Amino acid sequence: MDSFKVVLEGPAPWGFRLQGGKDFNVPLSISRLTPGGKAAQAGVAVGDWVLSIDGENAGSLTHIEAQNKIRACGERLSLGLSRAQPVQSKPQKASAPAADPPRYTFAPSVSLNKTARPFGAPPPADSAPQQNGQPLRPLVPDASKQRLMENTEDWRPRPGTGQSRSFRILAHLTGTEFMQDPDEEHLKKSSQVPRTEAPAPASSTPQEPWPGPTAPSPTSRPPWAVDPAFAERYAPDKTSTVLTRHSQPATPTPLQSRTSIVQAAAGGVPGGGSNNGKTPVCHQCHKVIRGRYLVALGHAYHPEEFVCSQCGKVLEEGGFFEEKGAIFCPPCYDVRYAPSCAKCKKKITGEIMHALKMTWHVHCFTCAACKTPIRNRAFYMEEGVPYCERDYEKMFGTKCHGCDFKIDAGDRFLEALGFSWHDTCFVCAICQINLEGKTFYSKKDRPLCKSHAFSHV
């Protein structure tokens, strides 16, 4: 591992992205670089571990704390980085082997560990193992690229039941990493690169057959690889696997009961029912209900005991009214509580008209002239009788003698010469001067001022 320090001159952006942190139990590292950015120009590489940020140890920082620390560095960012040395294979001297190298054959159901672990006999004591023939090239020549492939594993699309890398790290910390996802194992097997071993040179020396690899310890292999009956024991049709499925009721509620104001209960009742193991009790007779029942006003009833308080009619179907704790059918409610008409003194059971602080039948509150129901239109009262607007203007409307237009309510007017005038219409017929409150003369029912009293009109 090579440790070095990089100083980036601000301002942001710095041209790199972090991953990991104390909260992920993974050291902080560079996961992405912007091509041509400040970090790339300073020699930072993908996969470099971040040891310090602005002089502070990065090992104790969470991912968010590290981001905030970098944002706080305005004009100058100092990073302490560590880079792994690339793994290079060194060619070894070719020598005739004493025996053929062991060939490993893995059954399709055997799970491989994520990190390569030797099976069988331990490696020789020499730290540099001898190779025969052409040296094998490593699958990932750079350790930083290997870390990048592992760190970006969570970004690839995964099946719905696959485990993420963060979950596997947690499993490693809790000691449950051997429980590997079957879907993930299948994907790993399909993506493995087949490795071809160099053929060993023929040897004239007779060799004994290789006994095979030593079976690994049970703790390093998943249970479905060790136990051949694992798949059968945990099949979905076994009792150990519970499938929860939402089930619809066998018989739907009848449409007639749905549209009724009083509905037949399909589930439980307030305060008790099939949902909590209680039996419904009739609110009228206080007896346990066996069979069909009704729910109304928060209580359960026998269908034959939900009746009108006045006439005793069963209210199983149709509407009802509740007044002062008593239940009434619509006819009884209208007779008992419906208002009376101010004209005919009968109960109003249908459409009602409110006018003059009284209630009326619609057909009783009509115009005194045309006998048309007034309903929501404007009306005028004359001698205690209502008139529609059209008939009132025709019969009682006042017109100005000067302009021949109607004098509306609220208009200023005066009466002179036996006629009604708008205050602005009572003017001299010749000079048009206003004569309100002044002496005037009259000729041919037209007012004249003093100056034109003897003029011809």
From Swiss-Prot:
GO terms for biological process: actin cytoskeleton organization; cell differentiation; heart development; muscle structure development; ossification; receptor-mediated endocytosis. Residues 208-221 have a biased composition (Pro residues). It comes from the Eukaryota. Isoform 1 and isoform 2 are expressed ubiquitously, however, isoform 2 predominates in skeletal muscle, isoform 1 is more abundant in lung, spleen, leukocytes and fetal liver. The keyword Metal-binding applies. Keywords: Cytoplasm, Cytoskeleton, Developmental protein, Differentiation, LIM domain, Metal-binding, Methylation, Osteogenesis, Phosphoprotein, Repeat, Zinc. GO terms for molecular function: actin binding; metal ion binding; muscle alpha-actinin binding. One of its GO terms (cellular component) is actin cytoskeleton. May function as a scaffold on which the coordinated assembly of proteins can occur. May play a role as an adapter that, via its PDZ domain, localizes LIM-binding proteins to actin filaments of both skeletal muscle and nonmuscle tissues. Involved in both of the two fundamental mechanisms of bone formation, direct bone formation (e.g. embryonic flat bones mandible and cranium), and endochondral bone formation (e.g. embryonic long bone development). Plays a role during fracture repair. Involved in BMP6 signaling pathway. PANTHER family: PDZ AND LIM DOMAIN PROTEIN 7, PDZ AND LIM DOMAIN PROTEIN ZASP. The LIM zinc-binding 2 (LIM 2) domain interacts with TBX4. This is PDZ and LIM domain protein 7. It comes from Homo sapiens (Human).
